[in-house]
Amino acid sequence: MTRTIQLDETIDVQRPLHEVFAYISEFSRIEEWDPAVARGVRSTEGPLGVGSQFRIDMKAGFSLRYSVVEWEPERRLLMTVDSKPFTAREEIFFKRTADGTRVRYVANFDFVAPLARLAEMFPGVMDRVGKSAMAGMKRALEDRFDPPRSVWGTVLADKLVVPGVLGFTRFGYRSARRHWNPV
Protein backbone atom coordinates (compact mmCIF):
# COMPACT_ATOMS: atom_id res chain seq x y z
CA MET A 1 0.00 0.00 0.00
CA THR A 2 1.31 3.45 -0.89
CA ARG A 3 -0.11 6.90 -0.33
CA THR A 4 0.67 9.94 -2.48
CA ILE A 5 0.65 13.41 -0.98
CA GLN A 6 1.09 16.51 -3.10
CA LEU A 7 2.53 19.77 -1.84
CA ASP A 8 2.17 22.94 -3.89
CA GLU A 9 3.62 26.12 -2.37
CA THR A 10 4.56 29.48 -3.89
CA ILE A 11 6.64 32.36 -2.57
CA ASP A 12 7.59 35.75 -3.99
CA VAL A 13 10.97 37.23 -3.14
CA GLN A 14 12.60 40.54 -3.93
CA ARG A 15 15.70 39.10 -5.50
CA PRO A 16 16.82 38.74 -9.14
CA LEU A 17 15.85 35.53 -10.92
CA HIS A 18 19.44 34.48 -11.68
CA GLU A 19 20.42 34.75 -7.99
CA VAL A 20 17.36 32.81 -6.81
CA PHE A 21 17.95 30.02 -9.32
CA ALA A 22 21.65 29.80 -8.48
CA TYR A 23 20.95 29.60 -4.75
CA ILE A 24 18.16 27.02 -4.86
CA SER A 25 19.69 24.82 -7.58
CA GLU A 26 22.76 24.27 -5.39
CA PHE A 27 20.59 21.93 -3.35
CA SER A 28 23.33 21.12 -0.84
CA ARG A 29 22.43 24.50 0.71
CA ILE A 30 18.96 23.22 1.66
CA GLU A 31 20.05 23.06 5.30
CA GLU A 32 20.16 26.87 5.28
CA TRP A 33 16.43 27.14 4.66
CA ASP A 34 14.69 23.85 5.46
CA PRO A 35 14.41 23.39 9.24
CA ALA A 36 13.94 19.60 8.87
CA VAL A 37 17.37 19.17 7.25
CA ALA A 38 20.53 18.53 9.26
CA ARG A 39 23.00 18.55 6.36
CA GLY A 40 23.15 18.69 2.58
CA VAL A 41 26.06 17.35 0.52
CA ARG A 42 26.58 17.39 -3.22
CA SER A 43 27.48 13.85 -4.33
CA THR A 44 28.62 14.57 -7.89
CA GLU A 45 31.31 16.74 -9.41
CA GLY A 46 31.18 19.07 -12.37
CA PRO A 47 28.69 21.76 -13.26
CA LEU A 48 25.18 21.61 -11.86
CA GLY A 49 22.61 20.16 -14.22
CA VAL A 50 20.95 16.92 -15.27
CA GLY A 51 22.63 14.09 -13.38
CA SER A 52 23.68 16.17 -10.36
CA GLN A 53 23.03 14.32 -7.11
CA PHE A 54 22.75 15.40 -3.49
CA ARG A 55 22.59 13.52 -0.19
CA ILE A 56 20.32 15.26 2.29
CA ASP A 57 20.52 14.11 5.93
CA MET A 58 17.32 14.78 7.81
CA LYS A 59 17.11 15.69 11.49
CA ALA A 60 14.64 12.79 11.84
CA GLY A 61 17.56 10.38 11.29
CA PHE A 62 17.27 9.25 7.67
CA SER A 63 18.85 10.39 4.40
CA LEU A 64 17.40 11.37 1.04
CA ARG A 65 19.09 11.03 -2.34
CA TYR A 66 18.12 13.78 -4.78
CA SER A 67 18.85 13.41 -8.50
CA VAL A 68 18.31 16.22 -11.00
CA VAL A 69 16.45 14.72 -13.97
CA GLU A 70 15.43 17.90 -15.82
CA TRP A 71 17.19 21.27 -15.78
CA GLU A 72 15.98 24.45 -17.45
CA PRO A 73 18.21 27.31 -16.21
CA GLU A 74 16.24 30.09 -14.53
CA ARG A 75 12.96 28.30 -15.35
CA ARG A 76 12.60 24.87 -13.78
CA LEU A 77 14.21 22.01 -11.87
CA LEU A 78 12.82 18.49 -11.66
CA MET A 79 14.34 16.13 -9.13
CA THR A 80 13.61 12.60 -8.00
CA VAL A 81 14.01 11.70 -4.35
CA ASP A 82 14.80 8.24 -3.02
CA SER A 83 14.73 7.25 0.63
CA LYS A 84 13.54 4.41 2.85
CA PRO A 85 10.30 6.07 4.04
CA PHE A 86 9.23 7.55 0.70
CA THR A 87 10.05 8.44 -2.89
CA ALA A 88 9.16 11.75 -4.48
CA ARG A 89 9.25 13.95 -7.56
CA GLU A 90 9.97 17.56 -6.73
CA GLU A 91 9.56 20.28 -9.30
CA ILE A 92 10.59 23.88 -8.71
CA PHE A 93 9.45 26.63 -11.08
CA PHE A 94 11.07 30.07 -11.29
CA LYS A 95 9.45 33.15 -12.80
CA ARG A 96 10.61 36.75 -13.01
CA THR A 97 8.15 39.24 -11.48
CA ALA A 98 8.00 43.03 -11.49
CA ASP A 99 9.89 43.27 -8.22
CA GLY A 100 11.83 39.99 -8.02
CA THR A 101 11.16 36.29 -8.48
CA ARG A 102 8.31 33.85 -7.88
CA VAL A 103 9.25 30.34 -6.79
CA ARG A 104 6.69 27.54 -7.01
CA TYR A 105 7.46 24.20 -5.42
CA VAL A 106 5.38 21.15 -6.39
CA ALA A 107 6.17 17.78 -4.84
CA ASN A 108 4.50 14.39 -5.02
CA PHE A 109 5.50 12.12 -2.15
CA ASP A 110 4.78 8.38 -2.30
CA PHE A 111 4.85 6.87 1.18
CA VAL A 112 5.18 3.14 1.75
CA ALA A 113 3.27 1.20 4.42
CA PRO A 114 3.11 1.75 7.41
CA LEU A 115 3.94 5.43 6.79
CA ALA A 116 1.19 5.52 4.18
CA ARG A 117 -1.33 4.84 6.94
CA LEU A 118 0.18 7.60 9.12
CA ALA A 119 0.03 10.01 6.18
CA GLU A 120 -3.69 9.26 5.88
CA MET A 121 -4.26 9.79 9.59
CA PHE A 122 -2.29 13.06 9.79
CA PRO A 123 -2.58 14.76 6.39
CA GLY A 124 -1.63 18.20 7.71
CA VAL A 125 1.85 17.19 8.84
CA MET A 126 3.39 17.22 5.36
CA ASP A 127 1.58 20.47 4.58
CA ARG A 128 3.18 22.11 7.63
CA VAL A 129 6.59 20.73 6.65
CA GLY A 130 6.23 22.24 3.15
CA LYS A 131 5.07 25.62 4.45
CA SER A 132 7.92 25.70 6.96
CA ALA A 133 10.53 24.93 4.28
CA MET A 134 9.15 27.58 1.92
CA ALA A 135 9.05 30.18 4.71
CA GLY A 136 12.70 29.35 5.43
CA MET A 137 13.54 29.66 1.73
CA LYS A 138 11.88 33.08 1.60
CA ARG A 139 13.75 34.23 4.72
CA ALA A 140 17.07 33.03 3.31
CA LEU A 141 16.53 34.66 -0.09
CA GLU A 142 15.40 37.99 1.31
CA ASP A 143 18.59 38.17 3.37
CA ARG A 144 17.28 40.66 5.94
CA PHE A 145 19.28 39.50 8.92
CA ASP A 146 20.42 41.74 11.73
CA PRO A 147 24.20 42.15 11.94
CA PRO A 148 25.82 39.89 14.50
CA ARG A 149 26.20 41.33 17.99
CA SER A 150 29.39 41.13 19.98
CA VAL A 151 29.12 39.10 23.13
CA TRP A 152 31.38 39.55 26.11
CA GLY A 153 32.98 36.11 25.72
CA THR A 154 34.10 36.78 22.15
CA VAL A 155 35.33 40.29 22.94
CA LEU A 156 37.35 39.01 25.91
CA ALA A 157 38.78 36.06 23.94
CA ASP A 158 39.88 38.40 21.15
CA LYS A 159 41.60 40.75 23.62
CA LEU A 160 43.43 37.89 25.34
CA VAL A 161 44.58 36.59 21.90
CA VAL A 162 45.26 32.94 22.85
CA PRO A 163 41.59 32.09 23.57
CA GLY A 164 40.66 34.07 20.46
CA VAL A 165 42.82 31.76 18.35
CA LEU A 166 40.40 28.93 19.19
CA GLY A 167 37.89 30.68 16.94
CA PHE A 168 40.16 29.86 14.01
CA THR A 169 40.20 26.12 14.71
CA ARG A 170 37.81 23.36 13.69
CA PHE A 171 36.15 23.74 17.11
CA GLY A 172 35.66 27.48 16.56
CA TYR A 173 34.25 26.92 13.08
CA ARG A 174 31.72 24.36 14.30
CA SER A 175 30.55 26.41 17.25
CA ALA A 176 30.24 29.63 15.20
CA ARG A 177 28.43 27.91 12.32
CA ARG A 178 25.31 27.45 14.46
CA HIS A 179 24.81 31.21 14.39
CA TRP A 180 25.37 31.84 10.67
CA ASN A 181 22.60 32.96 8.38
CA PRO A 182 22.27 32.03 4.71
CA VAL A 183 23.80 34.39 2.18
Regions found by a protein language model. Give the residues of each.
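Terminal "cap-and-tail" regions of soluble proteins that handle hydrophobic small molecules
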Residues: 2-4, 97-183
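Hydrophobic ligand-binding cavity/cleft-lining segments
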Residues: 1-45, 156-183
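Hydrophobic-ligand binding "helix-grip"
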Residues: 31-32, 46, 55-104, 108-113, ...
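Amphipathic alpha-helical protein-protein interaction surfaces
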Residues: 16, 26-29, 73, 99, ...
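Generic recognition of short, well-ordered alpha-helical interface segments
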Residues: 15, 63, 128-132
